[in-house]
Amino acid sequence: MKLFKRSRQLHGWPAALMLAILALTAVGCGNEKTDTAAGAKPQGDLTLVVGAYSVAKDAMGDILPLFAAKWKADTGQTIVFQQSYEASGTQARSIVGGFEADVTLLAMQGDVEKLVKAGLVEPTWKDRGENGMVTRSVVALGTREGNPKGIKDFSDLAKPGVKVLYPNPKTSGGAQWDINAIYGAGLKHSEEQEGVKDPAAAKAFLESIHANVESLDKSGRASMAAFEYGVGDVIVTYENELLARIAQGIKYEVIIPKDTILIENPAAVVAKYADEHGTRKASEALLDYLLTPEAQEIFAKYGFRPVNKEVYAANESHYPIPAGLFDINYLGGWDEVRSTLYSKRGIWYQVLAGI
């Protein structure tokens, strides 16, 4: 793989891609750093480029050196990783636009499907492991220590004086999970009250909460930073984000709503780029490694719900199952969600426009 040749392709890239490159960090067996933007040759036999969503950054920081050590033991090759972490939607657009990631971890299946549509990821990507998924979580609520606003469920987010944070679903895959959870909870409420799903009632429920939103940030991590800076009373986010911050000593109260959505996070080989770089074998090995007990334990350490059954069972007590838990299929699947919620004139557009 000729990194210098690849670095020349940076000229003319859109601004979002330049930001992705500026965010690149390198992790290798000896923590070597690479600088492909300057054309420097990396200190390794093989370079893998990982383009992931921002929430995965901390766990991958622990996982990649372990995979590099295993690859070295198995093949004798030293691997250097170049890593870019962005909001999931931004990362997917960057890869479609020319950011040559070999492997991608994204917040949702819909973002991987964008890469399939662009001819970058093979349509069979879900055949690997747990339908292509490497972690799970649920949408949860985080409040300040002691839960001063008495938040118990999504419905409390619509109360007067409650300031809410969640990121923008146009840039953040995590935010789409958040909006899906709120909208789905609205459908669940209507089903309980009327016996059928009522999209109008679900939209009204989403509108009532959105009216209390303090700001729409670019990514889940940006919303978390704003909350910890003192903005808002409650944040809608991934359960794993809250658990990871608590493990780092940050004071949060975690509330799992009665009706919330199961999050599933995929990973895939970006086959077109991996084949061009001659990294397909290593890229597939990394995906397989993400499913091993060793890697899944690390994901669990950072608050994710493992897809490995044995690791999940060992940590099951940490993962409450709410009574009304639903998955994306309750909303009709990703194609239906994209059409109903996030299309040009969809429900999210209507909520923003106040129509």
Task: Please state what every model-predicted region is.
Residues S54-D58, S88-Q91, G110-E113, L141, ...:
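Solvent-exposed loop/turn segments at secondary-structure junctions
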Residues S190-P257:
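Ligand-binding pocket segment of bilobal, Venus flytrap-like solute-binding proteins
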Residues C29-A118, D127-R128, Y238:
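Early extracytoplasmic/lumenal segment of secretory-pathway proteins
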Residues M1-D45:
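Short, low-complexity disordered leader/linker segments with a strong preference
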Residues A274-I355:
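Extracellular/periplasmic juxtamembrane helices and adjacent flexible linkers that interface
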Residues M133-S137, K203-H210, D217, Q248-R280, ...:
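Periplasmic-binding protein-like
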Residues V116-H189:
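A conserved helix-loop-strand patch within extracytoplasmic ligand-binding domains
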Residues G98-T104, G161-K163, Y229-T237:
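Alpha-to-beta junction loops
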